[in-house]
């Protein structure tokens, strides 16, 4: 596919700028310093914004934000400027923000000014084009407590009355609207109406608890000294007569029309899309975009350092990557070409456009590429323990040092008690205790593990955080029935715990380090459709003949997996072959640690013999002829389909698994072993997302530069560590029972490389394990115990707040029954709309259920009773009343 863009379609044309002089205001910025600065462009004026006004914008202006931080760190509005040595690597970001009502002159001016700033800073900054209400996660991270957008049309108007929209979960946006009208109301929002003598806080019925809490905080900060009255969506008539009369002078209740939350869905459509297209930009008289024939983007697709590539996230965001050897003119014109692409594709005008430069790509860009390995080199956290042997010192260190536990993903040293259950079909069978643990690929296994902390110090015990882990392991050939039964059994075990615990759901191929550690790196995975455990009841020895490939070189990353056929053998591999004798074969390029792990697996089967490549006896070749052949062994790297078992990989690729049959699990294809444990490369930087359900779809906001204070008790979060996806459940979060659905939906829709078989972990607030806490700076175990819900905040406001009938006189919440909640969930219309002829009704109204679209106030006014009372009436009576009031 090819697109062609003419010069007239671009927003930025460098050749029209005769002389790129740098504004004197920009020259005050230290070039090699950690810093944060904001400038405002109002017509022809560029002025620096005072620090006290950071986070306040006018919708008629354009703004420029510059943020510089150490690599891997994040700047924000509180960052203090600090000079750095020339050899210190900095990340630089330039954002230009356009208000909803910004003039074309301001748009043009800001485009020129960012080129000046970029040039002054050495043309190495990433540039983001931001628009009001659709800002990037990085922009939002600069303002931890949210930001305010004031109306430029009201600059010269009286201070009161004013109307504000307050919404967004993590970063509260307060938007001042130019007119006071019902058209600005939405059931998703909290609305604030400020008058000279009173502040109304209108609570949209679809707003979340965290939005309501943030809104009350905002009101108390911005409306101090003014009496506050809280008005609930649909219950406006319950205001006192005095307050209602004042309200009606500005927002007549007879004209009430509030948009339903569902009308905002278009704003979020495909918000979590993980689909991408890559175009190569070519200048052939005019700009041509040649689409590359790729699926999931790979770093190798950006192969031309002299060129420019465009990454299209189907209208959600447009990224321009400029090669390190591309002409300067291409770097300058990249943003304009991105804007022209948006217009050509008829994407929304507020689509995010970002320009990045080779060697200076932000992490948000790098993670879009599943195989961008060198992106993680700057990550300060490795995932390989310092030692491959765990003595008392190491075990104790894991207990007292959460960061070490998080880096290694080891809760303890794996010496605690374990109980194993095998789930096959609908049968759950406890596995006899044995040093030899064998899993089969056609079944699921549930492991209940008791955490063992090598200390009695209370602080260290609190640091570990949990006492039990429930692991659910699903084989690659396990049926849907087996996985479903294991899922129910594991969840019931987790939900029934009497002590702090963690639930981990994982698949073959994705075993995390601690899971392998509890088996001391000697877990055996057998293939084939076995319905019984392959044990001899008397000797507890493995029966029949088989071939095991041993992956890994340490107890936390090793396991042995059965292979049924070999096409080649690498000299880096180790195998255990069970025939009439047990043989441990080690390639000449295998490491000493890998050989030790192979010998440990062989020892489980009894007397064994170590065989080194090149020193095989005739007896060996005769014994293993059905599996091994000298012609298969390829010296050195060879062409083995398995990856090297290098000192820290612990994973390879097994290309000869038995075929899946029947109804099998939706995991990664069983013919590829990838990333089974601790990788040779550092893990990706950890990501934190606030997640919630909206109309059966999972939505999420990324929180860059996170800390523990970003976790709210009434929310659910995803912590993505790369190898394990944690679901953190706040103590008062809704939908807690859907924790696995949350994680699975996230993995399937994340806009970067993830497999559906990624391991998932569930942790609850105040029961966080050390492997989770260690990803946060200065974790406080008691943080959040003084959390105040919206209902409690509303109650605690006491005499400061005058509430309508939703709350009793003493401020306690009126508990609505489920029928009343269902009633409040419907879109509301004025009575005049609902009594129209059927063909005149809005399309989302069921003519037989018109009454549910009345507000509570209108319902009581019409029927002289609440909906709950109405719903208790006999069917004939309800029908008679609806006919009487023309609602049928």
From Swiss-Prot:
GO terms for biological process: actin filament severing; actin polymerization or depolymerization; barbed-end actin filament capping; imaginal disc-derived wing hair organization; ovarian nurse cell to oocyte transport. Germline specific in adult flies. SUPFAM superfamilies: Actin depolymerizing proteins (SSF55753), C-terminal, gelsolin-like domain of Sec23/24 (SSF82754), VHP, Villin headpiece domain (SSF47050). Keywords: Actin capping, Actin-binding, Developmental protein, Differentiation, Oogenesis. InterPro entries: ADF-H/Gelsolin-like_dom_sf (IPR029006), Gelsolin-like_dom (IPR007123), Gelsolin-like_dom_sf (IPR036180), Villin/Gelsolin (IPR007122), Villin_headpiece (IPR003128), Villin_headpiece_dom_sf (IPR036886). Residues 823-888 form the HP domain. GO terms for molecular function: actin binding; actin filament binding; calcium ion binding; phosphatidylinositol-4,5-bisphosphate binding. GO terms for cellular component: actin cytoskeleton; cytoplasm. Gelsolin-like repeats lie at residues 307-366. Belongs to the villin/gelsolin family. Required for the formation of cytoplasmic actin filament bundles in nurse cells, possibly by regulating both the polymerization and organization of actin filaments. Mutations in quail result in female sterility due to the disruption of cytoplasmic transport from the nurse cells into the oocyte late in oogenesis. This is Villin-like protein quail. It comes from Drosophila melanogaster. The lineage of its organism: Eukaryota, Metazoa, Ecdysozoa, Arthropoda, Hexapoda. The gene is qua.
């Amino acid at each position: 596919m090819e697109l062609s863009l003419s010069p007239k379609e671009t927003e930025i044309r460098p050749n029209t700028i005769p002389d790129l002089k740098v504004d004197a205001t920009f020259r005050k910025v230290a070039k090699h310093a950690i810093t944060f600065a904001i400038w405002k462009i109002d017509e022809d004026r560029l002025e620096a914004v005072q620090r006290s006004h950071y986070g306040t914008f006018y919708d008629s202006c354009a703004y420029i934000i510059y943020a510089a931080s150490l690599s891997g760190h994040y700047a924000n509005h509180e960052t203090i400027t600090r000079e750095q040595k020339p050899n210190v690597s900095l990340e630089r970001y330039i954002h230009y923000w356009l208000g909803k009502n910004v003039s074309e002159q301001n748009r043009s001016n800001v485009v020129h000014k960012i080129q000046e700033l970029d040039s002054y800073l050495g043309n190495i900054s990433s540039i983001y084009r931001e628009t009001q209400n659709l800002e990037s996660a990085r922009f939002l991270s600069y303002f931890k407590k949210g930001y305010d957008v004031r109306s430029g049309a009201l600059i010269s108007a009286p201070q009161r009355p004013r109307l504000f929209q307050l919404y967004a979960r993590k970063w509260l946006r307060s938007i001042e609207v130019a007119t006071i009208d019902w058209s600005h109301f939405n059931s998703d929002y909290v609305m604030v109406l400020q008058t000279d003598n009173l502040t109304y806080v209108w609570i949209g019925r679809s707003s979340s608890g965290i939005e309501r809490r943030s809104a009350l905080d905002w009101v108390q900060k911005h409306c101090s000294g003014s009496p506050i009255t809280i008005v609930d969506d649909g219950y406006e008539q319950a205001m006192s007569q005095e307050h209602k009369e004042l309200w009606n002078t500005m927002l007549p209740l007879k004209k009430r029309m509030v948009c339903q939350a569902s009308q905002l869905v278009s704003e979020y459509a495909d918000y979590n899309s993980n689909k991408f297209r890559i175009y190569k930009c070519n200048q052939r008289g005019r700009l041509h975009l040649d689409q590359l024939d790729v699926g999931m983007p790979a770093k190798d697709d950006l192969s031309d350092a002299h060129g420019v590539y465009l990454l299209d996230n189907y209208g959600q965001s447009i990224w321009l990557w400029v090669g390190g050897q591309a002409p300067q003119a291409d770097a300058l014109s990249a943003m304009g070409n991105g804007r022209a692409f948006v217009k050509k594709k008829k994407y929304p005008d507020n689509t995010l456009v970002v320009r990045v430069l080779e060697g200076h790509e932000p992490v948000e860009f790098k993670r879009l590429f599943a195989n961008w390995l060198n992106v993680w080199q700057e990550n300060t956290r490795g995932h390989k323990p310092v030692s491959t042997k765990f003595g008392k010192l190491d075990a104790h260190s894991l207990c007292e040092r959460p960061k070490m536990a998080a880096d290694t993903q080891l809760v303890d040293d794996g010496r605690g008690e374990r109980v194993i259950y095998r789930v096959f079909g609908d049968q759950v069978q406890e596995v006899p205790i044995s040093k030899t643990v064998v899993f089969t690929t056609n079944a699921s296994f549930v492991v209940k593990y008791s955490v063992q902390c090598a200390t009695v110090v209370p602080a260290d015990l609190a640091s570990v955080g949990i006492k039990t882990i429930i692991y659910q392991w699903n084989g690659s050939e396990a049926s849907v029935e087996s996985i479903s039964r294991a899922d129910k059994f594991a969840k019931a075990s987790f939900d029934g715990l009497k002590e702090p615990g963690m639930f981990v759901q994982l698949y073959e191929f994705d075993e995390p380090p601690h899971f392998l550690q509890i088996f001391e790196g000697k877990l055996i995975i057998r293939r084939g459709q076995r319905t019984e455990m392959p044990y001899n009841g008397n000797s507890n020895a493995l029966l029949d003949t088989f071939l095991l490939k041993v992956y890994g070189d340490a107890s936390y990353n090793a396991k042995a997996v059965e292979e049924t056929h070999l096409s080649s053998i690498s000299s880096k591999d180790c195998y255990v072959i069970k025939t009439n004798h047990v043989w441990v074969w080690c390639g000449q390029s295998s490491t000493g640690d890998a050989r030790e792990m192979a010998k440990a697996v062989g020892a489980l089967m009894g007397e064994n013999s170590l065989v080194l490549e090149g020193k095989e006896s005739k007896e060996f070749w005769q014994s293993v002829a059905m599996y091994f052949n000298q012609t298969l062994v390829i010296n050195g790297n060879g062409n083995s389909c398995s990856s090297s078992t290098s000192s820290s990989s612990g994973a390879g690729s097994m290309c000869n698994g038995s075929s899946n049959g029947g109804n099998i699990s939706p995991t990664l294809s069983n013919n590829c072993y990838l990333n089974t444990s601790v990788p040779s490369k550092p893990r990706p930087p950890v990501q934190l997302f606030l997640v919630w359900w909206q109309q059966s779809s999972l939505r999420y906001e990324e929180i860059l530069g996170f800390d523990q204070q970003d976790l709210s008790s009434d929310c659910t979060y995803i912590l993505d560590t790369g190898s394990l996806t944690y679901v953190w459940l706040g103590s008062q979060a809704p939908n807690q029972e859907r924790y696995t659905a949350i994680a699975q939906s996230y993995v399937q829709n994340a806009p970067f490389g993830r497999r559906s078989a990624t391991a998932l972990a569930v942790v609850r607030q105040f029961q966080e394990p050390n492997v989770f806490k260690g990803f946060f700076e200065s974790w406080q175990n008691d943080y959040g115990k003084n959390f105040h819900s919206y209902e409690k905040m509303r109650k605690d406001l006491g005499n400061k707040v005058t509430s309508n009938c939703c709350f009793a006189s003493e401020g306690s919440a009126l508990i609505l029954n489920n029928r009343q909640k269902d009633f409040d969930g419907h879109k509301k219309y004025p009575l005049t709309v609902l009594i129209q002829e059927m063909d005149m009704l809005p399309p989302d109204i069921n003519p037989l259920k018109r009454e549910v679209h009345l507000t509570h106030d209108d319902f009581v006014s019409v029927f002289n009773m609440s909906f709950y009372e109405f719903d208790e009436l006999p069917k004939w009576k309800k029908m008679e009343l609806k006919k009487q009031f023309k609602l049928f």
